């Protein structure tokens, strides 16, 4: 079995009487793109600072390559951090910003030049080497910060919400570039974000945080499609949530009642009769039918369209059910498909196939 590059063992961190991290344990593998995901104040950036050495744990141990680093200062941990602010030297050129650490080590000039241009080439900035960083765009400044961080080829690159200040198009482009850079370097990246889309599109694994503890660790697919609890389901993407009670258990299915309609669901958790559950359906798994499109309505819920949002590639619908509950549906747009011509206040039927839902134990 491969030894993890980083081992986080039962970490606690408090500031005075305020707990920030509570019994956090985590392994990080060699060459992995791992994302720490969670809302503001959940402890993800604190964990990053503990790994880098800028903070010390109240209790617990951190190992890098099998060595406990609790007492090691940041410069001896072979990890580098890209901060949200980039922390560039505004009076220096791109070249000198990237070369700074090498000059501090009194590296020969010829070697500095080669290594700096190698790093700039990786982030596609070699043509701007002599430009002052104040003259660069936000995306270019971020690339400089990354080049400076990888100049010494650390084992781990820590990225603290580095894309948060970029506009949407640039952020999307940088997501792809960061992932490609990580693959090229075969370096371990630990990426902090509160943006679910970033986490899903970039990560090998996602660690979902909430109130200082880990809710779930898994691949993007696992975290999205099989959330461990209600918080994960609601935080990762959109979710329609129904509170249901198991009426009968039949083979591998359960039978329940939603909005007065009897529905069957896959019994994925060995749930029992009378047990209360959360039933979760993603908007993209809901199908919306006009009255003229269906003859048999068994297993369908009646509703009324109360909002239509055209997004180019998708049409998002808000449907009010008979109880007044609003659910969200998302359909891929096809301009040649008449089925996607919905009308505000139109009466419709909604459904999903058994197995497309997620069932979770009820949380009170």
UniProtKB/Swiss-Prot annotation:
Task: Kindly indicate whether the keyword Nucleotide-binding belongs to this entry.
Answer: yes
How does the record classify its membrane topology?
Answer: Peripheral membrane protein
The EC number on file is 7.6.2.11
InterPro entries assigned: AAA+_ATPase, ABC_SmlMolc_Importer, ABC_transporter-like_ATP-bd, ABC_transporter-like_CS, Mo/tungstate-bd_C_term_dom, P-loop_NTPase, PotA-like, Transp-assoc_OB_typ2
Known SMART domains for this protein?
Answer: AAA
Which superkingdom heads the taxonomic lineage of this protein's source?
Answer: Bacteria
Q: Which residues bind ATP?
A: 38-45
Q: Name one GO molecular function term.
A: ATP hydrolysis activity
Query: What residue stretches are annotated with the ABC transporter domain?
Result: 6-236
Q: Describe its function.
A: Part of the ABC transporter complex PotABCD involved in spermidine/putrescine import. Responsible for energy coupling to the transport system.
What residue intervals traverse the membrane? Answer: none
Catalysis performed (reactions): ATP + H2O + polyamine-[polyamine-binding protein]Side 1 = ADP + phosphate + polyamineSide 2 + [polyamine-binding protein]Side 1
Q: What is its main location?
A: membrane
Q: Which UniProt keywords apply?
A: ATP-binding, Cell inner membrane, Cell membrane, Membrane, Nucleotide-binding, Translocase, Transport
Where in or outside the cell it occurs: the entry states: Cell inner membrane
Q: What GO cellular component is one of the record's annotations?
A: ATP-binding cassette (ABC) transporter complex
The entry sums up its family as follows: Belongs to the ABC transporter superfamily. Spermidine/putrescine importer (TC 3.A.1.11.1) family.
Coiled-coil ranges (or none): none
Q: Fill in the subunit field for this protein.
A: The complex is composed of two ATP-binding proteins (PotA), two transmembrane proteins (PotB and PotC) and a solute-binding protein (PotD).
Please name the source species. Answer: Legionella pneumophila (strain Lens)
Q: Name it.
A: Spermidine/putrescine import ATP-binding protein PotA
């Amino acid at each position: 079995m491969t030894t993890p590059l980083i081992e986080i063992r039962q970490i606690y961190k408090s500031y005075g009487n305020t707990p920030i991290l509570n019994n956090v344990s985590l392994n990080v593998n060699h060459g992995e793109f791992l994302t720490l995901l969670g809302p503001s104040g959940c402890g993800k950036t604190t964990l990053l600072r503990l790994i880098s050495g800028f903070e010390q744990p109240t209790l617990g141990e951190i190992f890098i390559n099998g060595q406990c680093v609790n007492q090691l200062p940041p410069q001896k941990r072979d990890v580098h951090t890209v901060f949200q602010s980039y922390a560039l030297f505004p009076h220096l050129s791109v070249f000198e910003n990237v070369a700074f650490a090498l000059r501090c080590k009194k590296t020969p000039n010829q070697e500095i030049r080669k290594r700096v241009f190698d790093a700039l080439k990786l982030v596609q900035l070699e043509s701007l080497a002599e430009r002052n960083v104040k003259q660069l765009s936000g995306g270019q400044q971020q690339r400089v910060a990354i080049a400076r961080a990888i100049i010494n080829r650390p084992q781990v690159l820590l990225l603290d919400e580095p894309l948060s200040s970029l506009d949407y198009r640039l952020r999307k482009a940088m997501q792809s570039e960061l992932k490609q850079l990580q693959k090229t370097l075969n370096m371990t990246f630990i990426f902090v974000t509160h943006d679910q889309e970033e986490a899903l599109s970039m990560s090998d694994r996602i660690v979902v945080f909430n109130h200082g503890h880990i809710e779930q660790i898994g691949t993007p697919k696992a975290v999205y499609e099989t959330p461990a609890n209600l918080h994960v389901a609601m935080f990762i993407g959109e979710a329609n949530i129904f509170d249901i009670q198991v009426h009968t258990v039949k083979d591998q299915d359960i039978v329940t009642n939603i909005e007065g309609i009897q529905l069957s669901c896959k019994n994925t958790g060995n749930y029992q009769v009378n047990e209360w559950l959360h039933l979760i359906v993603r908007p993209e798994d809901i199908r919306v039918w006009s009255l003229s499109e269906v003859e048999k309505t068994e297993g369908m819920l009646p509703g009324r369209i109360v909002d239509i949002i055209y997004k180019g590639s998708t049409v998002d619908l808000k449907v009010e059910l008979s109880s007044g509950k609003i659910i969200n549906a998302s359909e891929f747009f096809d301009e040649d498909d008449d089925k996607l011509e919905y009308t505000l206040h139109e009466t419709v039927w909604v459904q999903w196939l058994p197995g497309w839902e997620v069932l979770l134990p009820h949380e009170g």
